[in-house]
Amino acid sequence: MLEQASNLHLFADVLARVHAICAALAKDGNWPEGIDVSRVVVEPPRDPSHGDMATNAAMVLAKEAKAKPRDLAEAIAERLRADELVAKVDVAGPGFINLTLHPVVWARQLGTILRDGDAYGRIAPVVGAPKVNVEYVSANPTGPMHVGHCRGAVFGDALCSLLQFAGRDVTREYYINDAGAQVDVLARSAFLRYREALGEEIGAIPEGLYPGDYLKPVGQALAAEHGDRLKAMPEAQWLPIVRDKAIAMMMAEIKDDLAALNIRHDVFFSERSLIAGSTNKVAETIEFLRERGDVYEGRLPPPKGAPVEDWEDREQLLFRATAYGDDVDRPLIKSDGSYTYFASDIANHRHKFERGFADLIDVFGADHGGYIKRMQAAVKAVTAAQAVLDVKVVQLVKLLRNGEPVKMSKRSGDFVTLREVVDEVGRDAVRFMMLYRKNDAVLDFDLAKVIEQSRDNPVFYVQYGHARGHSIFRNARDSFPSLPVEEGARLAFLRQAKLEKLADPSEIDLLKRLALYPRTVESAALAHEPHRVAFYLYDLASEFHALWTRGRDLPYLRFIIDDDAELTMARLAMVQGVVSVLASGLAILGVNAPDAMR
């Protein structure tokens, strides 16, 4: 039985060893004190034929060490060759170092998976790390969620789970845009449906109001609650009544839609509360900026090229955004005296900082790409650069069926709803496929393809990998009935396996893939890119399925060898490693890991 030599994941373990070698060389060679090793990395080489790992240590430290990169690489390589983990070290090119590890190291890493189960790769809470606030979805409460909202919702939810797995304290937030002109349009649209519910013939929906049938229940609820008394009121009197009812019903529907996708939020924060609360936080924030010289009365120059949003040729109150990296200063108050959306957003992010968040992440739709610089400038200003805002832009989703665009629904009027998609293909397919492409790339989502049972359908292929693993366990009990059914007991049982029996190159390759998981999670969390986990899971499932297929053709590679209990237990331990990692990664993505599939 093998034990993992370190609680670090394997790449971090080797990096620590490289750091120790550099520290020893620095002491022996009188390098400058405090030499910066933060840029030293240990990662898989681009070409697997170059070895198992590569480090840039010599390339990034040579200047400070006052040495030639190649000479420094040879010195580091000489000490690495004495390391118990390392079978071979090569210096390539101007000073890159490639390492090949002993095969037993990969089996030892499997021992760590058997110890940790689906917690393998989880990072302990980071002491002293700033609290993270992730704002995502934040769809206007003016209608049901559409398939475009779906991608941002899944991305934000998976990112939160990823960050929590990586040891961060995360709050999931939804910002309710309930204070702008669009909710007044919602109220007027709902009032039309209210009149319809009272028996009026309303005809075609006027341009500028929200079409579709989804506001009919709001109109019916208003009629049931108020009868016809709202009709006699002037707009200024009925509008807030209708608006509040419509917002409440739309938010209830949005929350139901999110629940269908298992999207969770800890906080639903109202934009209106910034203005209508006991303190007008927007006015307070503007005054805060004024005291620091970050707002002024001025006139913006005419836009060059593409129109600048909110530009008006008049003297107005401006935020000095250019002082914080933006391209142009930004208006805070409209000509009618109301606040710009940007002013409310500044107050919202200042409020987050006051609540103790210094690591802020906003998930924006593709149409908000031009909003990034101004928001990052605002966060710098209102937090004195003590908070950092990362904005992740989620690109459009093209909804297809067998390659053809999907028609819009009557209920929504001009879009396909999230609920329609989830009802047709299921939550797991939606969640996985929304993450199976980098967030800033347009996504083609084909309703027919995502339910195919083939390797061309990534969600099926990954889930089938987990189910296949459990199928192997069930079959193994026919010959080895002592193999436990319960997960924890099975992990403990398989920890006794002789993992050094895993020696075939295809088995070692699979073990190497398993060893990559903690590094994948760590790098995905640092980059705020959950798609990396989805890509990794597909690659892992592919290698697992390929090994199973080879065993069907080559009996000596089968997972279950009836007359060789030791080899079978080692291979079942490897299968358990695959099952545990697939379950862990799918949990981060919010996708079910089935034990069986039809």
Curated annotation (Swiss-Prot):
<comment type="similarity">
    <text>Belongs to the class-I aminoacyl-tRNA synthetase family.</text>
</comment>
<keyword id="KW-0963">Cytoplasm</keyword>
<dbReference type="InterPro" id="IPR009080">
    <property type="entry name" value="tRNAsynth_Ia_anticodon-bd"/>
</dbReference>
<dbReference type="InterPro" id="IPR005148">
    <property type="entry name" value="Arg-tRNA-synth_N"/>
</dbReference>
<dbReference type="InterPro" id="IPR008909">
    <property type="entry name" value="DALR_anticod-bd"/>
</dbReference>
<dbReference type="GO" id="GO:0004814">
    <property type="term" value="F:arginine-tRNA ligase activity"/>
</dbReference>
<dbReference type="GO" id="GO:0005524">
    <property type="term" value="F:ATP binding"/>
</dbReference>
<dbReference type="GO" id="GO:0005737">
    <property type="term" value="C:cytoplasm"/>
</dbReference>
<dbReference type="InterPro" id="IPR036695">
    <property type="entry name" value="Arg-tRNA-synth_N_sf"/>
</dbReference>
<keyword id="KW-0067">ATP-binding</keyword>
<dbReference type="InterPro" id="IPR001412">
    <property type="entry name" value="aa-tRNA-synth_I_CS"/>
</dbReference>
<keyword id="KW-0030">Aminoacyl-tRNA synthetase</keyword>
<keyword id="KW-0648">Protein biosynthesis</keyword>
<dbReference type="Pfam" id="PF00750">
    <property type="entry name" value="tRNA-synt_1d"/>
</dbReference>
<dbReference type="InterPro" id="IPR014729">
    <property type="entry name" value="Rossmann-like_a/b/a_fold"/>
</dbReference>
<dbReference type="Pfam" id="PF05746">
    <property type="entry name" value="DALR_1"/>
</dbReference>
<protein>
    <recommendedName>
        <fullName>Arginine--tRNA ligase</fullName>
        <ecNumber>6.1.1.19</ecNumber>
    </recommendedName>
</protein>
<comment type="subunit">
    <text>Monomer.</text>
</comment>
<dbReference type="InterPro" id="IPR035684">
    <property type="entry name" value="ArgRS_core"/>
</dbReference>
<dbReference type="InterPro" id="IPR001278">
    <property type="entry name" value="Arg-tRNA-ligase"/>
</dbReference>
<dbReference type="Pfam" id="PF03485">
    <property type="entry name" value="Arg_tRNA_synt_N"/>
</dbReference>
<dbReference type="GO" id="GO:0006420">
    <property type="term" value="P:arginyl-tRNA aminoacylation"/>
</dbReference>
<keyword id="KW-0436">Ligase</keyword>
<feature type="short sequence motif" description="'HIGH' region">
    <location>
        <begin position="139"/>
        <end position="149"/>
    </location>
</feature>
<keyword id="KW-0547">Nucleotide-binding</keyword>
